[in-house]
Amino acid sequence: MDRSQALYYPWDSFCLLSRCSIFILSTTLEDSRTLLSHLGLQNPHEVQGTFVPEARVPGVRLEATAGHQSLSEPSGWVYYRHKHSDLVDPADLHLQGASYRRSTIRSYLMVKKVLYLVSSAP
């Protein structure tokens, strides 16, 4: 994945993996891990990638998972998965489609930033 396709926001202002894992679904798992290493994430080996043949369209996809519920925004290929029991506040994520109780976890601010970070490979 070309650097110009990946870098849209400085990641050094927060620790992305402190409370969550990011799943970057590009054309290959290798591209995903290479991208995360380039972005300076502390534990790129913790990140999983999946081959997505539809990833020719630029954009970002967000999926927030809490328990057995999930929300998604079908506009690209970045996944966010919360590791803890707190549920997602849809007002923070700007998503609709399921009922979640409010959470004060600040990592949801990171999710907003992720939406501007990655575009899929051509």
Curated annotation (Swiss-Prot):
It comes from the Eukaryota. Induction: Expression is up-regulated during nitrogen starvation. Part of the gene cluster that mediates the biosynthesis of elsinochromes, pigments consisting of at least four interconvertible tautomers (A, B, C and D) that have a core phenolic quinone to which various side chains are attached and which play an important role in fungal pathogenesis. The non-reducing polyketide synthase PKS1 was proposed to iteratively catalyze decarboxylation between acetyl-CoA and malonyl-CoA subunits for polyketide chain elongation. This is Elsinochromes biosynthesis cluster protein HP4. It comes from Elsinoe fawcettii. The gene is HP4.
